[in-house]
Structures are given as structure tokens and as C-alpha cells.
């Protein structure tokens, strides 16, 4: 509380995309509904991209936008999708799905605040060349040194709250400097 922050270790614990779609079909809420999709611990690394595509296919008709979350620090090796080879494959396959299914809702990539400028630039360049709409910046950070209380510096999980503000704003400013066209 002193740091106005939370460290979470939740990951993507849920009942799955089919359960989500069932709930979305029954929703009475009339506001904007965004669906955050991400690989969970049951997703095998070699199938993660296909898992994202399955989720997109199932939810796009029932949501106003989709967030492709590749930046949760609580799912083992998920941030590996930030490397160029994996990122290229993910964006290329999502782009194919968007065109094949004629998806008209925006799809965004949610990025980590811990990535290098080079990685962020690479991602932004790929997004600009695709049918994706933009990025959501940022997820939680693994950098606990942002906390005043040193006893929490070694805790596992994603840090959110006030200590992350400057780091997230730096990422947002950097992304904005790369392209005035990307939301």
C-alpha cells in the first residue's frame, strides 16, 4: 500500500474460450466489450499461436475489440512472443485470419513495459504493415526495483500501480514517436 501498487501472480486462470463465448452470447451489457486473449499454462509453446487464432475465431463476433496479450509475466515463456521470429509468425497469421474472416473489429497487441526500444520498434513496424489496429501499452512489469520497499524486490509476478507509471509513459511516448498513425 505504501507504494500504491499490487504484485499479482494470477496468470490467465479461467474456464476457457468456449465458456467465455457462452457468457458473451448471453450478455445484457450494451457498452463496449473488449476480449483479452492470452496463452495459459495449458497452451504448449509450439501451439500458442494457433491457440490465439482459435480464440480470435471464436470471440470476434461477440466483442467490440480484441487484445492479443503476449506480455503477461505470469505465463511461463509467454514474453518469448516478443522475439522477432515468433512475433512475425503471430502477426502474419493474425493478419491472414483478419482478411479470411473479414474481421472488422480492431485487434491490438498488448506489450510489455520491459521490452527494449529495438523490440518495440520491430513490433510497431510489423503492426503498421498488417491489418492490426495498434498496441495496448502496457502490461505489468517484472521490475520490482521500482518499489520503495526492498523486501518486495525479489517477489515473483507482475507489478502494477503508481511505480509503473513512468515506465509505461516512456513506452507510450516512444511508440508515439515511431508512428503518429498507430493508436
Name each model feature, range by range.
Residues 20, 35, 68-69, 110, ...:
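Conserved, mostly hydrophobic/aromatic
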Residues 38-42, 71-73, 110-114, 138-142:
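Active-site beta-loop-alpha junctions enriched in small/polar residues
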Residues 40-53, 80, 86, 108-128:
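Active-site glycine- and acidic-residue-rich loops that bind
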Residues 1-31:
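A gly/proline- and charged-residue-enriched helix-loop-helix capping module
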Residues 9-19, 44-57:
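Glycine-rich anion/phosphate-binding loops
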Residues 48-100, 112:
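Metal-dependent enolase-superfamily TIM-barrel catalytic cores that perform enediolate-based chemistry
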